[in-house]
């Protein structure tokens, strides 16, 4: 039986409901048909009477299957029960067949693997020992689930005879991640893991119909001995293969819209992970493009900058109201966009050529369309003055916003977002909370994309941002910048820990340090704080102020550090090439942030109102 979220987890729910005649096998049971019917279970250690494999022999088979299935990177956290996999991976690494990264903290390891999968487009694996080590992967697995990222969890476990006995570091690991994974299998000690690994990789990469890519758990039980035999040794080292060189951001072209299409005042919304097809569609149909930064569509002649401040000027009572909405990707950043999509009088359609992991069918109001031809019929083509009106309003809004920001020599969140966007190149990761929203507000769309943009918008948590950025930088093999707030930075400070023998990424970490969480001041909590009715509760419970010396923290981890407080100094720092790891700390004051946003909104409203009244 598949629960309400079966569209997302597909092979998981039934996997852990074995039929009476499943025979607790772990070989033939791992075919897609067997998994779907609920017969992939485990129990005895020698399924079908097959000879029991040694721990290292089984691990070598698992590694071969992983590499054959496209895994190029494995992040390893140390542990004894996972030793057979670690030794087998070391052998493959010595042959130049896989890249290994070592991280002490499993939570950081999970997000590093997530970043590797994001930047390479290939499944990336993370290996842990048994016990709490596996549980530390839950945040990365949850993000990978909702963001459709092929993350392979390799969790080592005790053999069946030690489970439930109080054996050290032993808990119930099979299906630990529940509905967060596309596939979970418990592979008994001594059994051949090949087909289970193959099925897991198929599920992770979206090979099964109606199942989006996403994380899987391969729970591998090992029995002593866990180390190689005395006669074993590493292969002769071969030249290490580098699997990826960062590519330039993409630009697509579509044929111009047919003149037979109906003219409609349609807008194109490009949410997270929309891709360049959104820009191409807007351009081909002469429609305004309202693109979030992580859409990788925020460029081109149709892109409108501070669009979220313009939507109220094109509402139902406006001279030129929005008639339809075409959505690419997932919108996550602003309430005005959510309000537009919720309007019953404005039909909307979602371009969805493949299964996605961020919503359940029937739970959203947009009409899902699989083909661009159907989308074109829905959207129509823009009237002659529709795009021009939006571009004029957008230009006026951008100018007004820039004037307000120019009045403040000290750096502010929006001015930092504007500068980071302007100077971005290579790869850019935008942290959750205010950072990505500052870029969305103030980042000027460019004629062509300058960087490939990433963000953890699956669940939009602040977890693991530094580690994700490290994985992105190492996977893409080009300079990478990450913009994040101080709370997000401190939440993953352990992600700065990279051993002396490990490869160092080209990573610039821009930290907007306003000594706490500023986003709550821009929400309703800011009004509560201003009213003073709850004393210092808002500051203490939501802003969570701190006095961390980021320079000292950087020095402790061996990471370069510089501090700036003005927009001019930040622009100079961002113009420098990225060499190794460095932190640019931007020291700001959040006490007047709510007032700054009010001034921006007022200035933009006046400027746009003047343009539209002509």
Language model region names:
Residues 15-16, 45-53, 329, 338-436, ...:
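Phosphate/pyrophosphate-binding active-site segments
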Residues 143, 154, 161-174, 438-614:
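Thiamine diphosphate
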Residues 114, 118, 129-130, 136, ...:
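Glycine-rich, anion-gripping cofactor-binding loops and their flanking helix/strand elements
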Residues 59-63, 80-86, 389-477:
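Active-site diphosphate/adenylate-binding microenvironment
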Residues 52-127, 132-142, 442:
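N-terminal cofactor/phosphate-binding cores enriched in small/glycine residues
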Residues 77-79, 189, 219-222, 269-274, ...:
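Structural motif
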Residues 70-73, 118-128, 134-136, 143-149, ...:
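Structural signature of the thiamine diphosphate
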Residues 144, 155-200, 291-398, 499, ...:
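Glycine-rich, acidic loop regions that bind phosphate or pyrophosphate groups
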């Amino acid at each position: 039986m598949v629960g309400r979220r079966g569209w997302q987890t597909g092979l998981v729910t039934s996997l852990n409901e074995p039929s009476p005649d499943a025979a607790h096998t772990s070989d033939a049971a791992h075919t897609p048909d067997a998994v779907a019917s609920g017969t992939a279970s485990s129990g005895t250690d020698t399924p079908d009477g097959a000879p029991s494999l040694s721990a290292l022999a089984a691990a070598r088979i698992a590694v071969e299957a992983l590499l054959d299935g496209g895994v190029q990177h494995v992040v390893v956290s140390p542990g004894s029960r996972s030793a057979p996999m670690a030794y087998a991976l070391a052998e493959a690494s010595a042959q130049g067949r896989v890249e290994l990264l070592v991280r002490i903290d499993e939570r950081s390891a999970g997000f590093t693997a997530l970043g590797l999968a994001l930047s390479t487009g290939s499944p990336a694996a993370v290996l842990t020992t048994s016990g709490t080590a596996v549980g530390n992967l839950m945040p990365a697995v949850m993000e990978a689930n909702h963001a459709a990222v092929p993350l392979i969890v390799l969790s080592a476990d005790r053999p069946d005879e030690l489970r439930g006995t109080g054996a050290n570091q032993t808990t119930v690991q099979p299906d630990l991640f529940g509905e967060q994974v596309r596939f979970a299998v418990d592979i008994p000690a001594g059994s051949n893991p090949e087909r289970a690994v193959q099925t897991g990789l198929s599920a992770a990469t979206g090979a099964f119909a109606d199942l989006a890519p996403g994380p899987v758990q391969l729970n591998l039980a090992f029995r002593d001995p866990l180390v190689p035999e005395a006669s074993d040794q590493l292969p002769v080292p071969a030249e290490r293969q580098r699997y990826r060189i960062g590519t330039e951001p993409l630009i697509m072209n579509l044929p111009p819209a047919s003149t037979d299409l109906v003219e409609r005042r349609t807008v194109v919304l490009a949410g997270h992970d929309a891709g360049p097809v959104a820009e191409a569609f807007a351009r081909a149909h002469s429609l305004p493009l309202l693109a979030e930064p992580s859409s990788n569509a925020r460029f081109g002649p149709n892109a409108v900058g501070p669009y979220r401040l313009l939507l109220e000027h094109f509402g139902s009572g406006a001279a030129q109201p929005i008639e339809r909405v075409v959505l690419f990707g997932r919108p996550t950043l602003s309430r005005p966009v959510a309000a537009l999509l919720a309007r019953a009088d404005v039909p909307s359609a979602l371009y969805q050529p493949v299964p996605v992991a961020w919503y359940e069918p029937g739970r959203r109001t947009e009409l899902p369309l699989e083909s661009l031809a159907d989308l074109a019929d829905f959207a129509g083509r823009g009237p002659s003055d529709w795009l021009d009106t939006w571009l004029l309003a957008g230009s006026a809004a951008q100018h007004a916003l820039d004037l307000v920001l120019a009045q403040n020599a000290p750096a502010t969140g929006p001015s930092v977002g504007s500068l980071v966007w302007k100077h971005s190149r290579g790869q850019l990761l935008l942290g959750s909370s205010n950072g990505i929203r500052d870029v969305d507000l103030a980042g000027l769309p460019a004629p062509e994309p300058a960087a490939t943009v990433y963000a953890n918008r699956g669940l939009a948590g602040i977890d693991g941002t530094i580690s994700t950025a490290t994985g992105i930088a190492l996977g893409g093999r080009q300079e990478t910048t990450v913009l994040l707030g101080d709370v997000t930075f401190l939440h993953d400070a352990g992600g700065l820990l990279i051993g002396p023998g490990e490869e160092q990424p080209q990573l610039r970490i821009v930290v907007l340090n306003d000594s706490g969480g500023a986003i709550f001041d821009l929400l309703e909590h800011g009004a509560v704080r201003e009213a003073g009715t709850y004393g210092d509760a808002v500051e203490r419970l939501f802003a969570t102020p701190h006095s961390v010396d980021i320079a000292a923290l950087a020095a402790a981890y061996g990471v370069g550090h510089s501090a700036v407080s003005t927009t001019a100094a930040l622009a100079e720092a961002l113009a420098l090439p990225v060499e190794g790891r460095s932190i640019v700390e931007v020291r700001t004051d959040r006490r007047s942030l709510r007032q700054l946003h009010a001034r921006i909104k007022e200035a933009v409203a006046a400027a746009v109102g003047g343009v539209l009244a002509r």
